[in-house]
């Protein structure tokens, strides 16, 4: 194992297949309160006390089973899971990596984990997903192979950017291209962080820039991942191309479990 400056232990995990090497990254954090809206009925796994229950396989079962079914490599970052739980569910292809306590929200900190892991482990294709409400329908390697000109692939949310309090953060942190966002916010769909992927170099750059942006923002209690995502893909990486929704992911919160024409189902 390797230990980085944040205290994360890393397993060098490679797929030596003759095909493109693809990794799915996710997280299962239980030591801090779940940061999503407690009044949202679509949030899965949040207990009455605000925390996600420890050692609860049902929390990740659908995601886990879909990884196994598609014979994919995956890494799940965790903080409060028991060694017995990890030993029971870890396989040659699905690895659990425990992390030390952290200051950011559960949603934000996972990207620091992803960045650090990829700096030590190189793949061809990288996707991150939520573990509680995302299912992998089929190997997303094909999606990337069939779309050479696209850098990022993402889930599309169910609302427009203007319906999300994005501009508050844009103003607060003095981000660039404010006028562009104001002009387009009623037409732009909100990009959802629950599924994002691309080629290794693009995703490592994405995670590095996410972490850099997040550190500059300060205020670690702010659950910022959705805000930073919009800013990165629509402004910082405006010379790169991204697609969202079909064929990457099902319609968000429509629970389209029967779909086989997309690569991921997100709620």
Q: Where do the PLM segments sit?
A:
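A short acidic, often aromatic-flanked loop/helix-cap motif at beta-alpha or helix-coil junctions
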Residues: 101-107, 160-161, 247-254
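Short catalytic/ligand-binding loop motif for oxyanion handling, primarily in non-cytosolic enzymes
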Residues: 32-35, 83-86, 134-138, 143-145, ...
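GT-A fold catalytic core of metal-dependent nucleotide-sugar glycosyltransferases
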Residues: 113-167
